């Protein structure tokens, strides 16, 4: 199982606009439940902490495999959500990780191979050819 977690801040010059944007984001992503093969679980949480360094919203998803996450990135329903949200989302952070504890796979070194200079371990910066850095949202 692969977990895909994305956090954002949303645009909005005032509290009412930000609240509308958060509600739209939550509704759009929740509309993906049951529509994407291999997407096992989806949650959208809006921050309640009120701390100034928190992100506004988190998307927590579980996929049956890495291949399912890759397919999700190009699935028509996911692409529809991306279009619907436009540039509403800012300050994006992402982490993808194997939750099965696959033996022999080191999540830091990607099975023992050294990361190229500047590579992102957390998956924040997409990296061509590296499945852990797939840009999905």
Question: Where in the sequence are the language-model features?
Answer:
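C-terminal structural segments of small proteins and small subunits
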Residues: 66-87, 91-93
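Short S/T/G/P-rich N-terminal loop/turn motif that feeds into the first structured element of a domain
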Residues: 1-55, 64-70, 97-137
């Amino acid at each position: 199982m692969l977990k895909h977690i994305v956090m954002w801040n949303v645009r909005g010059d005032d509290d009412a606009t930000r609240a509308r944007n958060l509600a739209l984001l939550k509704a759009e992503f929740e509309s993906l439940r049951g529509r994407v093969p291999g997407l096992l679980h989806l949650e959208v949480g809006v921050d309640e902490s009120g701390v100034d360094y928190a992100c506004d919203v988190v998307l927590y998803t579980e996929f049956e495999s890495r291949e399912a996450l890759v397919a999700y990135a190009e699935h028509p329903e996911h692409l529809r959500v991306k279009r619907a949200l436009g540039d509403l989302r800012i300050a994006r952070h992402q982490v993808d990780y194997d939750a099965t504890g696959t033996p022999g796979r080191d999540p830091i070194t990607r099975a023992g191979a050294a990361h190229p200079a500047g590579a992102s371990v957390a998956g924040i910066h997409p990296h061509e050819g590296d499945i852990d850095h797939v840009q999905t949202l």
